[in-house]
Amino acid sequence: MDEQHQPWPLIFLRPSGARFEISVAAWQTMQGFIQHASNATEAGGVLLGRHLRDGSAIIVDAVTAPMAGDRRARTRFHRAQQRHQAAIDAAWAASEGTRTYLGEWHTHPERIPTPSPVDRADWHRRLLQDRYTAPLFFMIVGTAAVAVWEGHRPDVIVQLAGFIPGA
């Protein structure tokens, strides 16, 4: 593949100045569910990855895709908790404790994605109820853009700035 058509990871800047990076492989999985067709349903899953020890970046190197039991509609996605949790547990075990749950992703049938009231309520619920010690990330994949938010307890949510490497 020539350099001009080389796939790049997606990189977002966190408020701390560190990077939040989506690997090419993870991004390619999500791209397969972009809602270009008028009858396409929302899709989603969990973000899996690693915190670099030096604190310079968090890398999403895998995602779960829609699974049996997920509920999908044109403007709604609800993931089956147990099946995605099994994938989280398997990733953790296979990596000997280095690949972890980082957050959630889903698609929207709009060019520039904006969180719905249902999305925001779900994010706030996760920040209050999920068991975690690091920030959680919430990613929405639109038909022409991607947006990522970083969440901290109890309910602070900030949109991250994105950029394209090599641009």
PLM regions with names:
Residues 106-108:
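Histidine-centered divalent metal-coordination motifs
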Residues 1-101, 110-167:
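Conserved beta-strand-loop surface patch within small alpha/beta domains used
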